[in-house]
Amino acid sequence: MSDPTASPVASLAPAPSPVASLARTYADVTEVRASDPAAVAKAWQRRTTRPTVRGDGRLMIVAADHPARGALAVGSRPTAMNSRIDLLDRLRAALADPGVDGVLATADVLDDLVLLGALEDKVVFSSFNRGGLAGSSFELDDRMTGATAASTAGARMNGGKMLCRIDLDDPCTVSTLAACARAVDELAAHGLIAMVEPFMSNRVDGKVRNDLSPDAVIKSVHISQGLGSTSAYTWMKLPVVDEMDRVMESTTMPTLLLGGDPTDPDAAFASWQKALDLPAVKGLIVGRTLLYPPDDDVAGAVSTAVKLVR
């Protein structure tokens, strides 16, 4: 496992699964990647999968696809996500909670986790478009540079997630919409969930900003839930904003609430609790708020979120 001086949560990461682990340490992960890269695909085929919805129908998903977009900051910590080993420690600590149903991440992170045996009986969502790097001049030209429907199906995952930022003043938006529509159809053809995360966005002083007003979120939902030739497998991933009851009247799609970049975790938990009572809301899909709490108590933050969902 990692050097505990490098990761404040290293001691919380569980031992590798005896069922499917092909790597016991992070050094093992690198060695497997170097000497037997085909073992990654084998690990995905050996993994015990599970249906997305079971039991009470609620979901608690941990998200970790931010680094692939170059978004490494958390709150006031600009380099919080620099260390992959530290991130993996935090993810493994979160996934060890039996109330956590699964994870959303890019292939690099998911492959590490599957080699470590951390994805047994977990829901897994791949991440599709990471091309619009944070802060870049081409940020809204958000091309599909991550997973595909074929790779997601081949690894026996539950679905794929795509960001759909809509800037009415940026001509690249139409390409993003078309790419998301294709991804919705391709996932549906495999019987897999298309998790769509929409925002109305614009540039303010050169930086892309998401409009989190209720009416803007409602408009983004209407645009994005109409993508593709079928909505049978479409789910929404939405921010918690003011007038959330009105926002949720805009869709019949199953919806997971996202966390965003935390500024006040206590306020975030309170807002989630209220929104989770709305009928179409099926749970949380949260990353930085749970993985990088101010006190670095990942297990405590995750436990609090699980109690809200369950």
Which residue ranges define each predicted feature?
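Short acidic/histidine-rich active-site segments
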Residues: L284-L291
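Glycine-rich beta-alpha junction loops
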Residues: D65-H66, D261-P262, L290
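Thr-Gly-centered strand-to-loop micro-motif
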Residues: L258-G259, V286
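Alpha/beta enzyme core
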Residues: A68, V74-P98, G102, L110, ...
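C-terminal helical cap(s) of enzyme catalytic domains, especially alpha/beta-barrels
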Residues: L291-R310
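N-terminal amphipathic alpha-helix/helix-capping segment at the start of soluble metabolic enzymes
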Residues: S2-D65, G70, V114-D121
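Short conserved micro-motifs at the rims of enzyme active sites and ligand-binding pockets
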Residues: L72-G75, D295-D297
